[in-house]
Amino acid sequence: MRASITASSGQDPRFGDLHEALVDAMALAGVPAEVSVDCFAAAGDGLVHVLVPGAYLPHVHPAAYPSADQLRRTLLVVTESPGAPGFDRSAALAETAAATFVLDPGAVPELARKGIRARLLPLGHVPAWDIWGGAESERPIDLAVLGDFSDRRARAVALAGPALAGRRAALHLVRKPLTPATAAATPSGAAKRELLANARVLLLVHEREGRSFDWLEALPAIANGAVIQSEQPSDHGPLVAGRHFECAGFYALSTALEGLLASPDRLERVRSEAYDFIRAERPLSAVGAALREAIDSTSAAAGHASGARGRLTVPMPLQAEGPTPAVERLQEHPSEGDVVRAALKQALVRQRRLERELRRLDADGDGAGPDDRVVEIGSSDAPQPRVSVVVTLYNYANTIAGALRSVGLSDLDEVEVVLVDDASTDDSLAVARAALEEMSWLPGRIVERGANGGLPAARNAGIAHARADYVFVLDADNVVHPGGLRLLADALDREPGADFAYGVIRQVGPAGPMGLLSWAPWDPWWLRIDNYIDAMAMLRRSSVEVVGGYTSDEAFMGWEDFELWCNMASHGMSGEFVPELVADYRTGHISMLSLTTLDTTDGWTALFDRYEFLREPA
């Protein structure tokens, strides 16, 4: 008697952890187990298959799906909850499978309504997952967030911003498909367990509107002492809310999280009770016993010489489907709306070009424009800064003071501000001066441009006047968090080979937090799809100088930061991702974003013409 777990080379790393637990459980029950990748193992005497449908079916060719004969010798472990994508597909397999186990208690009655008998797999404490051991330990990470990215999860993290003020976080939301670079940057296996053993709280948010409990995230967290703060789940037995984990409604999560993080005694109580419970009531031997019973029954029913036939027993992995690359989207026939948006964008570009030229002529009759005027601010004997914050300004009188004050409130001492006023026509410069005068401790300079040259030229001027090796780019309508500059500078210190560093940014609208930007690790592969990194990043000045700074080519108007990331990628440069909230991006006003998103055809065309790697198959 032996078992073969059918896995996929393209599966989510969480399923690798589950397979490891199943192998260990069967070993405790005296059943040797192997793992077959991307196909079912060849039939043999006493062989029983174990299949987690969600780990296998999405990642292999249909020819590698189990046949009816194979299913009759297969134990299913269904990880999906009722209503979740993939649940009905797993249920269809369960109609023929020898036995079906589920992780979600709510799946048992749902499958029963379909005439399928399913048993709850008593998964709990897995020794291989537990690197903590229950001993007292320092936990430097206040909050960890793991799992696939969804707009809902992103908004929950954005809403939790106040609870994270002054605290450390590890925000790892995964973008699918899982590319090699993304997989390498995503905590899994031993790295994930180490993260959980160093985290005080793990935040669980339903990916969609369903209320299923995420067992594959919760159990490794409990095994390593990370307390679960979950959105209100439906079926979570045998765990008890308030004893083994904490829960709250979606819009109450931030308040609940803040209260939990501020209560060390409560954290310790929940941590201990949850850990002791899964060790005592859900040992891995119980999983082994349940699987052994099902394996014995399956072997007896099939007979030792079943010769069960299946499909081809050769690996047949399937390349994961991802978003359509921009080069393919561009080849699609444009709609009437696309044509109108493209024409409107061209009109706006021409209008801005004309306005800029008129301002130049107004400033100087011959159109050349006066030179920039530089005014030093703050202490004249300020030490060499570690970070220069370049703030570009053009007619943002209502928001510039907030942006500058956020720099002054940074917990990094060695910082200067370089304010570049791009010939504002309102009282933006006066407001900025007043804000800087209130912060005498903040050194730097004001660069007053004689004529408006546009955003990329203003940023390049700021970088040219910066004294620090690290330059953070801040627009006049955004704010940097108190710890943001320090986190990014520390990242560049740790990774001398990185050319820039960026962190997670909250997107905030008039009604409050909306979602996240810059939440994915550096991977040039994704530049074929979209610009996923905001301009608010910390640049190594020497690297920016190598690529020539921000382009002033009007073909990239509104896309200057995207062009910079593509330029750096084409030079083999890289960015260091910091999985913490570092800044707020404000929306709901007229901004360069409106021009960027109005029409994308011209921008993509210019990028494809300049950077060959963007045209390569994604």
Regions found by a protein language model. Name each.
Residues 405-414:
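Short, acidic, metal-binding catalytic loop of nucleotide-sugar glycosyltransferases
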Residues 2-116, 127-130, 238, 426:
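Extended catalytic core of nucleotide-activated donor transferases of GT-like folds
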